[in-house]
């Protein structure tokens, strides 16, 4: 418990209360609801049915590894015997471990006791926000993805502060779990691998950077290959949705794809702004066969070329829709639909951990970034730690853009990991700013965090 806030007994009590709240919510969602003793308020939608059906297949089969989603959640479902109550309890327990690990790691890299408390409590309150907690009661990939994200960030911070084989091994293992939980996660891992290779030019970082870069690239390539091996490929319907909802709703984009072979006719004119995956004639009807052929043969290539040749559109459109990044309140709709939205104390605590106002979150981002950059420039924050926090925030933005461009359907849900990652970065940055102010101007030796000085 080195580096925990003092008094340590109080910190342990906070962690205990957090665990009770998370697991208590899981038990309630899994065992009570709708007026019956056994009537689970578990989020179970079309994706859930596909995941549980694929989880029946043998682990090494193509149907399992290249199924309807990345196989990480399918493996969890199989280990839980595809029992929805067991899945809720297990992924909630994993969430407790992951969030506590991240919160205590953040506390351990602070020097002042005040900053340790702010970092730890802020992270735990974020985990209790209704828009985050509700996913523990859903039969989807979000909860496991967030737990993997917490593990990646915690091991990453530990690796930056005190490089060691154990931290490196933990970081690589967490990257694997993260990459094989959601397809957009694999893209983020691939980007991280490229940065790791760039860091390998520094002699002191060469070995860990090469290990992270090689492993991350292998995970990203493997996850992408499995996604492409699915039938249809997992990019197929997202590209179709994006074409119908976004590209055909924009005159300029429509002209571009028509010039690149899109079968524009009277039937295609009915597609703009429609969620075509839910429209049976588009999925199977003969009148839309040309559209399905175009998506499979040319769709992904043409869409990618459009983004590359129209960077203004590619950057501006997600920015205009940035509420999906800065607003964690809208996503609570899923909890209301399945009647399992955490209320009461969770709403109060969540308002602190993840403020509901997008405007407030944007202002918090700007103020924290300016203060953090200034103190890092004055070397009041350890350079390696400052770089790590900047990467966390930067990859949150990249993750949001990848989610927005990756699928036009359920953007708030697909951008959840990026939105949570942004708030984690904000809490770490805020704690580090307070830490630097509380400590005041110091010598180089005091830049070592508590977890290192205690050794």
Predicted segments with their positions:
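Extracytoplasmic catalytic/substrate-binding loops of multi-pass membrane glycan-assembly enzymes
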Residues: 30-52, 63-76, 82-85, 295-296
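Start-transfer (signal-anchor) and selected internal transmembrane alpha helices
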Residues: 1-31, 211, 440-441, 448-455
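Membrane-interface transmembrane helices that cradle and orient dolichyl/undecaprenyl
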Residues: 152-168, 200
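Membrane-proximal stem/loop segments at transmembrane-domain junctions that anchor or position
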Residues: 229-337
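Loop-to-helix entry region of an early transmembrane alpha helix in multi-pass inner-membrane enzymes
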Residues: 67-75, 82-100, 120, 135
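Membrane-interface anchor segments at the N-terminal boundary of transmembrane helices
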Residues: 9-11, 85-94, 314-392
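Membrane-interface alpha helices of multi-pass inner-membrane proteins
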Residues: 168-182, 213-220
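Transmembrane-helix motifs of polytopic, lipid-linked glycan transferases
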Residues: 89-113, 151
């Amino acid at each position: 418990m080195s580096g925990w806030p003092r008094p340590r007994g109080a910190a342990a009590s906070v962690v205990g209360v957090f665990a009770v709240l998370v697991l208590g919510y899981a038990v309630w969602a899994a065992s009570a609801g709708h007026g019956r003793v056994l009537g689970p308020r578990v989020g179970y939608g079309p994706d859930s049915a596909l995941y549980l059906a694929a989880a029946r297949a043998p682990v090494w089969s193509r149907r399992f590894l290249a199924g309807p989603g990345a196989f990480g959640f399918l493996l969890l479902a199989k280990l839980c015997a595809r029992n929805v109550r067991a899945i809720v309890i297990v992924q909630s327990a994993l969430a407790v471990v992951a969030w506590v690990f991240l919160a205590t790691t953040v506390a351990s890299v602070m020097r002042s006791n005040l900053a340790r408390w702010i970092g730890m409590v802020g992270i735990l309150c974020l985990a209790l926000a209704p828009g985050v907690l509700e996913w523990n009661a859903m039969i989807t990939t979000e909860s496991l993805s967030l737990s993997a994200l917490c593990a990646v960030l915690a091991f990453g911070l530990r690796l930056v502060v005190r490089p060691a084989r154990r931290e490196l091994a933990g970081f690589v293992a967490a990257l694997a779990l993260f990459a094989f939980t959601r397809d957009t996660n694999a893209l983020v891992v691939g980007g991280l691998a490229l940065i790791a290779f760039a860091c390998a030019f520094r002699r002191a970082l060469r070995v860990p950077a090469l290990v992270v870069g090689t492993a991350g690239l292998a995970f990203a390539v493997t996850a992408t290959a499995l996604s492409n091996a699915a039938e249809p490929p997992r990019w197929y319907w997202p590209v179709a949705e994006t074409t119908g909802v976004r590209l055909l709703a924009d005159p300029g984009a429509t002209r571009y794809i028509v010039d690149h072979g899109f079968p524009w006719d009277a039937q295609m004119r009915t597609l703009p702004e429609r969620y075509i995956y839910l429209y049976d004639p588009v999925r199977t009807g003969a009148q839309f066969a040309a559209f399905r052929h175009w998506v499979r043969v040319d769709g992904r290539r043409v869409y990618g070329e459009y983004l590359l040749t129209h960077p203004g559109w590619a950057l501006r459109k997600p920015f205009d829709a940035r509420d999906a990044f800065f607003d964690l309140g809208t996503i609570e709709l899923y909890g209301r639909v399945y009647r399992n939205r955490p209320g009461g104390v969770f709403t109060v605590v969540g308002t602190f951990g993840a403020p509901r106002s997008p405007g407030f979150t944007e202002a918090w981002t700007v103020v924290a970034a300016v203060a953090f950059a200034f103190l890092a420039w004055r070397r009041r924050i350890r350079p390696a730690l400052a770089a790590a926090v900047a990467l966390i925030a930067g990859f949150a933005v990249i993750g949001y853009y990848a989610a927005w461009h990756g699928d036009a359907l359920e953007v708030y849900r697909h951008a959840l990991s990026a939105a949570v990652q942004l708030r984690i970065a904000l809490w770490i940055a805020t704690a580090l700013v307070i830490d630097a102010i509380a400590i005041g101007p110091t010598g180089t030796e005091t830049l070592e965090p508590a977890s290192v000085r205690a050794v």
